[in-house]
C-alpha cells in the first residue's frame, strides 16, 4: 500500500492509457468495444481496442451518419401521395390473410438528429436504444472484429480517417473490412474496472446520503492481465496511513469529500476503462454519490470528448419493482448484482450477495470486516484496513466478469440479435421484441416469377402487444385482441388449414404442459425418453407467429398456416445457426478462444429460441395455450407408442427375450420415464443391453412421428426415486446422482439439504433404508453439536426473498358491494428481518428480489416474530429455536413414509424421535415431539389451507403443471400414517 498526493498519482498514471502516436495497419485487427451515437452532431463514436505487441491499445473514431426512427402517419391520405412521404407497412400483429385486404400501418421514417425531442420520445421504436438502431441500419456492431483498409495514424487515442474526409457510412467498404472470427487465434478484450464506496453512519442507523459522508471509494482497473488498485479516502482530520510493501494499492487522502469524488471521476478518464462494473450500484452507490455531490453534476469524461452526465432508464425487475438503471454514454456500465439477479441461468447460487456468488464461482470471499467495526476504525482514523476491504470488493466483480466470460456473452447477443451493451440486464421479452422488430422490417419473400428474394417488410408495433396482452384493460385476461383496430376477414376467406383459436374476446386462463401423477416409489433400471425441443418443434409445425393471426367476422381468431411467417423463419434460422455454432465449437481442438466464442453463440441462440414460447405466454396467452395443448397431445401419443411396444416381436427377437413390458411411470411436459420389465437372467451385460433396448425404443417411436417431432434417449437410471409431480432423483448409469425439484429449495438450510441428500444417497446406491436413517441421524447430531463452533452459521439459516409488494389482491364475492377496504400491511419474514437490519444500521440492506438469510430465536410468538437476520445473530447472547428446522425434517420423514410405506413407519419413528429429542433438549418455547397419526382419507384431496406462520411462499411444487388434465391423476398412496408435531406436555 503506497500513499500519494493526487497530483503525484496523476503524474504516475499519465501515460497509462495514452500510448502516444502509433499506426494501425491494414493487417491489424481491432474490435468495436462500445458505440455511442450523438443525436445533436449526427455522429457515431466507435470506441475500439486492438492488440499490438501483446498490449491493449485503445482508440476511437467518428463516423458521420444519420440515424432513423419511425412514427405513425395520421394524414387522411385523400391524395395519391402523402405529404409526409409515409410508407404503408403490413402490421406484424394480426395482419389478416394475404390477398384479402391486409391490415396496414402508415409509417414515416425520419432522421432522429433533425427531429424534435418530443418526436423521438414518442416514436414507434422508442423501446430501442440508439445503438440498437446502429446495429440494424449500419454494419457497425459492438463486439465485431474489423480492420482498416488503409494504414491509420492514431494521435491522442483518435483515428481521424483520411486528410480529405472523415469516416462516413457511404464509404464504409472503402475504409473498413469486417473480419471473420474463424480467422482469429485470440480475442480482444475490453479494459475492465470496478468501483465500490464505503459510507459512514452513526452506528445505529443505515447510511443516509443527506447526512453521512463517503469514507472511501475503491477503484480497480484490469488491463493486460494486470490490476491497478486505487483507494480514495476522505477524512476531515489530517490522517496518516502506514505504507506496506506487500500490497500495491495506491491510496490518496482527501480532506474534502467532493474533491475525493471528483478525483475518482477524473481517474476514470485517466485510466480509460471500457467497462465500469459495480455491485448494486444502481440502487446504492450511484444514488449515494449523487446525493453527496448535492447540486454538483456528475460528469464523466473520455478522451477529448465533451463531459457527459449519466442517463437513467426505468428497469422493472422480475418481481415487478421499479429501479433506475444508469447508462454512462462513453463507457459500458454493468451493475453485476442486477445482472445476476435478473439472469434465469444463475438459479444455482443461494442468494445474490457478492460473497455468496464469489464463493460459488471463484472460491474466494470478501474480507470479513463487520460494518460497525469499520465505522469504529474510521472514527479512530485506522484507515488501512478499510482500504484493503474496499479494494477487495472491487476485485471480485472483475474476477467474476472474466471467469464467466461475460464479455463474449454480451457481444454474442449484439452480433446475433441486434442487442447492445446497454441491454445486458434487460429481460428476455426485450430481446425477442428487438429480434422481431428487425426480422419484420427486413422480411423478404421469394418472387414466384423470378425466383429471387424481394423485400416484404412488416412493421412491429409494440403498442399492439400491449393491447392484445390486455395491459390497457382493467381486466387483463379479457378482450385483448378484440380491441385491435383491424378489418375483419370474411369467414369464406379463411384458409381451410387455419386453426381456430376461439373467440377474440375470450377469457384466458393459462394451461401448462401435461404432468402425470406418479406413484411414490423406487424404480430400478428405468430410462427417460425426452422430446427434442418440443415447443420449438410445435411452433414451427403449426406456424405460430403473431403475423399469422387473423381476426374473422365470425368473432373468432384463426392461426393461418403460413410457413413463411416472420417468427417461423426466425426459429428455423436460429436452429440452423445453433447447429452450425455447435459444429464449429466441437471442431476447435486447438483454439480455446474459438471454442469459447462458438459456445457463447450457440448458448445465446438457444436462449433466444427457447424464449419465444414464453414471449407468447406474456403477450398472447391464447396462442401459448394452443402450443401447450398440442404438446399435451404429443406426450399422450408418445406414451401410447412406448407402451404399445410391450412384447413387440421385433424387440423380443433382437434381444432374445421371452417377454418385455414398457410402462410409463411418470411424464412431464416433454419427457417420459419408462420402466422396462423382463427377466434379467435372459440378458448378458445388463447395462449395455438396457442401453441398446432404450436406443431401439427411441428409433421405433421416432419412426411413427411426423412434422419434425423427435424423442431422444436421455438417461438410463439405475435407481429412480419418484416422490410426486416434479419431485424426483436418480442414480444414472455414470454413477452420478441428479435431483429435480426435490431437496433443492433455497429456503431450506444448507446443512439439512446436505443431510437429506446424504441419506437419500444411501438408498440410491445401496437400496438400504437402515443406512439411510443412520446417516440422517449422524448428520443431524453432528450439526447440532457443532452449531456456532466449527460449522458456518450460514449452513443453518433459512432465507426468504424480500419483495416490497408481497401477495396478490384477493376479492370475495361480497367485495363488489362494498367500498374499498383499507390496505393491510403484510408483514412477511423477509420484511420483518429487513426492518431489523434497517433499524440496526447494517452495511447491507437487502433490496427487492434479495434473499434474506435468517434464523429463529427461542422466544414466545409466531414464526415471523421469532425470525432474526443471520447477519445480526449472536450465538453467545441469543438462543436458536429449532422448531422450523424440525418442521422441515417432519416433511422429509413423511416423504420417506410415502416412498417406503407403512411397513417402515416404526424405523422412521425411532430415528425421528431421537433427532427431535436432541434438538429440543435446551429449547424453552415450542417444544414438540413427533407422533404417528392415521391419515383421514376423506381429506386427502383437500388442498391444505395456508398456515399463517408459513411465511415463505417460495414453493416450487407443481408450478405450471396441467392440474386439470385428470388422466392418471389419482395418487396411489403407499402409507396410511403420517408424522405430525405435537407440543410436549409439561
From Swiss-Prot:
GO biological process: DNA-templated DNA replication; viral DNA genome replication; viral genome replication
Region (Disordered): 804-824, 944-969
Keyword tags: DNA replication, DNA-binding, DNA-directed DNA polymerase, Early protein, Nucleotidyltransferase, Transferase, Viral DNA replication
E.C. code: 2.7.7.7
GO MF assignments: DNA binding; DNA-directed DNA polymerase activity; nucleotide binding
InterPro entries for the chain: DNA-dir_DNA_pol_B, DNA-dir_DNA_pol_B_CS, DNA-dir_DNA_pol_B_exonuc, DNA-dir_DNA_pol_B_multi_dom, DNA/RNA_pol_sf, DNA_pol_B_thumb, DNA_pol_palm_dom_sf, DNA_pol_type-B
Bias (Acidic residues): 948-968
Official protein name in the record: DNA polymerase
Catalysed reactions listed for this entry: DNA(n) + a 2'-deoxyribonucleoside 5'-triphosphate = DNA(n+1) + diphosphate
Family membership noted in the UniProt record: Belongs to the DNA polymerase type-B family.
Species of origin: Bombyx mori nuclear polyhedrosis virus (BmNPV)
General function of this protein: Replicates the viral genome, host DNA polymerases cannot substitute for the viral enzyme in this process.
Amino acid at each position: 500500500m503506497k500513499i500519494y498526493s493526487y497530483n503525484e498519482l496523476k503524474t504516475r498514471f499519465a501515460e497509462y492509457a495514452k500510448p502516444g502516436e502509433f499506426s494501425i495497419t491494414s493487417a491489424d485487427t481491432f474490435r468495436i468495444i462500445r458505440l455511442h451515437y450523438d443525436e445533436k452532431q449526427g455522429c457515431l463514436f466507435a470506441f475500439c481496442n486492438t492488440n499490438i505487441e501483446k498490449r491493449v491499445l485503445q482508440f476511437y473514431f467518428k463516423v458521420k451518419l444519420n440515424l432513423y426512427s419511425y412514427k405513425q402517419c395520421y394524414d387522411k391520405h385523400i391524395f395519391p401521395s402523402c405529404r409526409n412521404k409515409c410508407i404503408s407497412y403490413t402490421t406484424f400483429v394480426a395482419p389478416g390473410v394475404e390477398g384479402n385486404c391486409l391490415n396496414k400501418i402508415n409509417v414515416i421514417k425520419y432522421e432522429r438528429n433533425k427531429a424534435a425531442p418530443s418526436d423521438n420520445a414518442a416514436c414507434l421504436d422508442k423501446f430501442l436504444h440508439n445503438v440498437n438502431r446502429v446495429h440494424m441500419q449500419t454494419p457497425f456492431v459492438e463486439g465485431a472484429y474489423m480492420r482498416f483498409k488503409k494504414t491509420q495514424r492514431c494521435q491522442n487515442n483518435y483515428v481521424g480517417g483520411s486528410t480529405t474526409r472523415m469516416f462516413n457510412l457511404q464509404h464504409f467498404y472503402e475504409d473498413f473490412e469486417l473480419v471473420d472470427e474463424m480467422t482469429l487465434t485470440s480475442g480482444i478484450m475490453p479494459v475492465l474496472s470496478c468501483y465500490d464506496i464505503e459510507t459512514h453512519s452513526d452506528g445505529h442507523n443505515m447510511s443516509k446520503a443527506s447526512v453521512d459522508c463517503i469514507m472511501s471509494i475503491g477503484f480497480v482497473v484490469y488491463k493486460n492481465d494486470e490490476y491497478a488498485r486505487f483507494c480514495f479516502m476522505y477524512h476531515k482530520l489530517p490522517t496518516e496511513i502506514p505504507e506496506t510493501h506487500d500490497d500495491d494499492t495506491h491510496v490518496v487522502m482527501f480532506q474534502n469529500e467532493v474533491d475525493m469524488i471528483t478525483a475518482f471521476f477524473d481517474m476514470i478518464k485517466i485510466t480509460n476503462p471500457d467497462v465500469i462494473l459495480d455491485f448494486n450500484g444502481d440502487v446504492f452507490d450511484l444514488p449515494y454519490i449523487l446525493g453527496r455531490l448535492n447540486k454538483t453534476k456528475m460528469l464523466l469524461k473520455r478522451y477529448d470528448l465533451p463531459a457527459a452526465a449519466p442517463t437513467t432508464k426505468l428497469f422493472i425487475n422480475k418481481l415487478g419493482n421499479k429501479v433506475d438503471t444508469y447508462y454512462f454514454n462513453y463507457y459500458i456500465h454493468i451493475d453485476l448484482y442486477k445482472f445476476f439477479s435478473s439472469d434465469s441461468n444463475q438459479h444455482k447460487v443461494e442468494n445474490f450477495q457478492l460473497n455468496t456468488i464469489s464463493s460459488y464461482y471463484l472460491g474466494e470471499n470478501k474480507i470479513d470486516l463487520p460494518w460497525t467495526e469499520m465505522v469504529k476504525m474510521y472514527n479512530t482514523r485506522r484507515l488501512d484496513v478499510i482500504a484493503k476491504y474496499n479494494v477487495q470488493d472491487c476485485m471480485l466483480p472483475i474476477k467474476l466478469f472474466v471467469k464467466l466470460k461475460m464479455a463474449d456473452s454480451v457481444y454474442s447477443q449484439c452480433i446475433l440479435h441486434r442487442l447492445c451493451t446497454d441491454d445486458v440486464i434487460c429481460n428476455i421479452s426485450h430481446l425477442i421484441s428487438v429480434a422481431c422488430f428487425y426480422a419484420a422490417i427486413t422480411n423478404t419473400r421469394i418472387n414466384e416469377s423470378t425466383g429471387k428474394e424481394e423485400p416484404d417488410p412488416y412493421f412491429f408495433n409494440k403498442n399492439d402487444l400491449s393491447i392484445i396482452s390486455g395491459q390497457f384493460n382493467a381486466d387483463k385476461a379479457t378482450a385483448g385482441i378484440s380491441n385491435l383496430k383491424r378489418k375483419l376477414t370474411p369467414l369464406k376467406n379463411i384458409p381451410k388449414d387455419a386453426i381456430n383459436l376461439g373467440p377474440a374476446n375470450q377469457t384466458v386462463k393459462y394451461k401448462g404442459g401435461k404432468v402425470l401423477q406418479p406413484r411414490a416409489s423406487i424404480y430400478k433400471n428405468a430410462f427417460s425418453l425426452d422430446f427434442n425441443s418440443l415447443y420449438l418443434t410445435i411452433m414451427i409445425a403449426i406456424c405460430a407467429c403473431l403475423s399469422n393471426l387473423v381476426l374473422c367476422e365470425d368473432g373468432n381468431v384463426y392461426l393461418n398456416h403460413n410457413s413463411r411467417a416472420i417468427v417461423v423463419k426466425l426459429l428455423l434460422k436460429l436452429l440452423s445457426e445453433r447447429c452450425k455454432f455447435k459444429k464449429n465449437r466441437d471442431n476447435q481442438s486447438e483454439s480455446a478462444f474459438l471454442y469459447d466464442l462458438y459456445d457463447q453463440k450457440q448458448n445465446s441462440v438457444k436462449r433466444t429460441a427457447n424464449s419465444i414460447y414464453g414471449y407468447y405466454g406474456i403477450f398472447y396467452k391464447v396462442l401459448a395455450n394452443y402450443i401447450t395443448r398440442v404438446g399435451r397431445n404429443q406426450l399422450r401419443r408418445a406414451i401410447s407408442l412406448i407402451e404399445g411396444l410391450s412384447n413387440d416381436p421385433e424387440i423380443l427377437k433382437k434381444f432374445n427375450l421371452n417377454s418385455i413390458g414398457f410402462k410409463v411411470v411418470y411424464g412431464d411436459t416433454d419427457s417420459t420415464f419408462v420402466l422396462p420389465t423382463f427377466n434379467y437372467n435372459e440378458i448378458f451385460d445388463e447395462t449395455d443391453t438396457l442401453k441398446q433396448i432404450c436406443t431401439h425404443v427411441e428409433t421405433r417411436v421416432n419412426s411413427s412421428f411426423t412434422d419434425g417431432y423427435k424423442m431422444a434417449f436421455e438417461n438410463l437410471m439405475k435407481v429412480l426415486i419418484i416422490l410426486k409431480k416434479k419431485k424426483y432423483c436418480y442414480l444414472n448409469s455414470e454413477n452420478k446422482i441428479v435431483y429435480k425439484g426435490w431437496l433443492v429449495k433455497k429456503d431450506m438450510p444448507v446443512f439439512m439439504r446436505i443431510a437429506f441428500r446424504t441419506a437419500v444417497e444411501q438408498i440410491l446406491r445401496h437400496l438400504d433404508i437402515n443406512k439411510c436413517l443412520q446417516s440422517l441421524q449422524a448428520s443431524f447430531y453432528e450439526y447440532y453439536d457443532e452449531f456456532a463452533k466449527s460449522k458456518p452459521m450460514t449452513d443453518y439459516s433459512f432465507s426468504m426473498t424480500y419483495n416490497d409488494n408481497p401477495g396478490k389482491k384477493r376479492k370475495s364475492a361480497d367485495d363488489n358491494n362494498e367500498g374499498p377496504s383499507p390496505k393491510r400491511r403484510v408483514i412477511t419474514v423477509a420484511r420483518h428481518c429487513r426492518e431489523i437490519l434497517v433499524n440496526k444500521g447494517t452495511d447491507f440492506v437487502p433490496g427487492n428480489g434479495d434473499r434474506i438469510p435468517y434464523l429463529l430465536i427461542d422466544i414466545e410468538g409466531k414464526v415471523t416474530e421469532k425470525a432474526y437476520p443471520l447477519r445480526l445473530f449472536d450465538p453467545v447472547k441469543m438462543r436458536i429455536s429449532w422448531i422450523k428446522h424440525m418442521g422441515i425434517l417432519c416433511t422429509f420423514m413423511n416423504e420417506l413414509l410415502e416412498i417406503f410405506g407403512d411397513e417402515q413407519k416404526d424405523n422412521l419413528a425411532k430415528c425421528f424421535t431421537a433427532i427431535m429429542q436432541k434438538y429440543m433438549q435446551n429449547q424453552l418455547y415450542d417444544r414438540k415431539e413427533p407422533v404417528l397419526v392415521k391419515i383421514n382419507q376423506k381429506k386427502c384431496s383437500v388442498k391444505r389451507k395456508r398456515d399463517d406462520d408459513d411465511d415463505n411462499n417460495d414453493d416450487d411444487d407443481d408450478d405450471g403443471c396441467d392440474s386439470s388434465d385428470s388422466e392418471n391423476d389419482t395418487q396411489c398412496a403407499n402409507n396410511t400414517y403420517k408424522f405430525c408435531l405435537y407440543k410436549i406436555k409439561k
